[in-house]
């Protein structure tokens, strides 16, 4: 048996959530089938000597082709901006020629962006990995902008590399940004619904989103939509030796809009309340691509907040912290940083948005707080070594049950029907 994955994302290095999921798929298929029968079609990719499976670099759409696709497809409602920017007839031919040469038994397309290249003649062997629902992501951004006047939204995130440089400022200016988000949410919903009905099976990482997508199309036909957990690199686990210091961690790629807004709003809205309650509290912000605006906010709090950039080995940091801060005001999917914390037995304090998709409560190692006073109280609770130890065990238990390698592989066996 052979399998192909078609994507415009290089999974390595695994420095973003989407990359972690794709790398996990490759690890699973490599384990089950062997590297010679796992093929990765990478649109816009380059040859690599160390890639773990068989890599097939494909051309990316030229700027002219991408803009032509936008002009022809977006106004008619045929495709989203992101689909159009990644479409060209040349890439279509390259994908189909490569698939014909391989003759795979299973084809997996990475989100609606690559689903447009699937040949319906082979629908019985095709799956679509939808990641999270883009339509809900953009709607959540708009809702957050309405609820929080201070919110700063950068909707392009990691997709910016596929957008012509001259067009990128439009996505960061408020008036065109809101219009673009509304349009993209509507178009993405159409494409997601189309994928749900078109593919043999559709995969998401969030149970709630999977159920909502299935319900959206229930009156139009049969759709197989399921949630699968991401396979994360097993975190180096050692028994935590927490001693009671009020040290907390925010972890995440700061170029992602929900992370940047989350840590900035935490600093402005919650951190002063925390410092009033715990004057010795300390927040360590770990993650690449901190904007100058966020850096300026962090510097207002002096030594109580440190920006540490990318940290390769998180063992020491997370084993001694009181908890992980996951203060998100918008977002979709499931947050890999929470899984990382659970795997290390680190309790999590999260907004309800950030905890979506996880089991919550003290018995699961995840506390939910949506207001500054609630957050401060939850953080203070975790500075009690005994309570922290109990929640640490609960966090580790949730990881072992749902996100450990054996549990994820068993889920993938069913999702991909290999066992």
For every predicted segment, state its role.
Residues 1-57, 276:
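N-terminal subdomain of nucleotide-sugar transferases
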Residues 21, 174-182, 186-189, 194-197, ...:
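Conserved catalytic-core segment of nucleotide-activated headgroup transferases in glycan assembly
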Residues 67-116, 162-199:
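Conserved nucleotide-sugar donor-binding subdomain of glycosyltransferases
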Residues 86, 386-416:
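A charged, aromatic-enriched C-terminal amphipathic alpha-helix characteristic of glycosyltransferases
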Residues 122-173:
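Active-site proximal beta-strand in glycosyltransferases
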Residues 200, 319-333, 346:
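Acidic donor-binding loop of glycosyltransferase active sites
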Residues 337-340, 347-351:
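Short hydrophobic beta-strand element within catalytic cores of glycosyltransferases
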Residues 365-373, 380-386:
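Conserved acidic donor-binding segment of nucleotide-sugar-dependent glycosyltransferases
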């Amino acid at each position: 048996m052979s399998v192909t994955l078609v994507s415009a994302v290089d999974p390595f290095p695994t420095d973003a959530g989407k990359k972690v999921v794709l790398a996990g798929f490759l690890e699973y298929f490599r384990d089950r089938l062997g590297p010679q029968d796992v093929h990765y079609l990478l649109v816009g990719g380059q040859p690599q000597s160390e890639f773990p499976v068989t890599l097939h670099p494909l051309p990316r759409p030229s700027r002219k082709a991408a803009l032509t696709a936008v002009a022809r497809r977006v106004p008619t409602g045929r495709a989203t901006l992101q689909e159009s920017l990644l479409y060209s007839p040349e890439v279509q031919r390259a994908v189909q020629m490569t698939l014909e040469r391989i003759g795979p038994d299973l084809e997996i397309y990475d989100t609606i962006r690559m689903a447009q290249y699937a040949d319906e003649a082979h629908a019985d062997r095709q799956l679509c990995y939808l990641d999270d629902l883009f339509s809900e992501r953009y709607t959540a951004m708009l809702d957050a902008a309405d609820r929080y006047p201070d919110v700063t939204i950068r909707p392009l995130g990691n997709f910016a590399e596929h957008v012509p440089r001259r067009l990128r400022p439009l996505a960061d200016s408020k008036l065109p940004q809101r219009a673009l988000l509304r349009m993209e949410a509507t178009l993405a919903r159409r494409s997601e619904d189309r994928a749900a009905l078109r593919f043999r099976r559709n995969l998401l990482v969030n149970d709630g989103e999977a159920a909502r997508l299935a319900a959206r199309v229930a009156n139009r036909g049969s759709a197989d939509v399921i949630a699968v957990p991401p396979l994360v690199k097993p975190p180096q686990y050692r028994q935590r030796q927490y001693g009671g210091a009020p040290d907390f961690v925010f972890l995440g790629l700061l170029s992602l809009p929900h992370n940047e807004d989350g840590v900035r709003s935490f600093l402005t809205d919650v951190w002063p309340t925390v410092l009033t309650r715990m004057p010795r509290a300390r927040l360590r912000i770990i993650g690449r691509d901190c904007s100058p605006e966020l850096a300026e906010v962090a510097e207002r709090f002096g030594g109580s907040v440190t920006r540490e950039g990318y940290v390769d080995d998180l063992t020491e940091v997370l084993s001694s912290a009181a908890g992980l801060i996951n203060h998100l005001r918008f977002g979709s999917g499931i947050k890999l940083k929470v899984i990382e914390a659970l795997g290390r037995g680190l309790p999590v304090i999260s907004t309800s948005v950030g905890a979506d998709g996880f089991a919550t409560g003290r018995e699961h190692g995840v506390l939910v707080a949506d207001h500054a006073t609630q957050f401060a109280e939850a953080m203070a609770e975790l500075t009690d070594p005994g309570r922290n130890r109990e929640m640490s065990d609960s966090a580790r238990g949730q990881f072992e049950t749902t996100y450990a390698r054996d549990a994820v592989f068993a889920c993938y066996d069913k999702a991909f029907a290999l066992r």
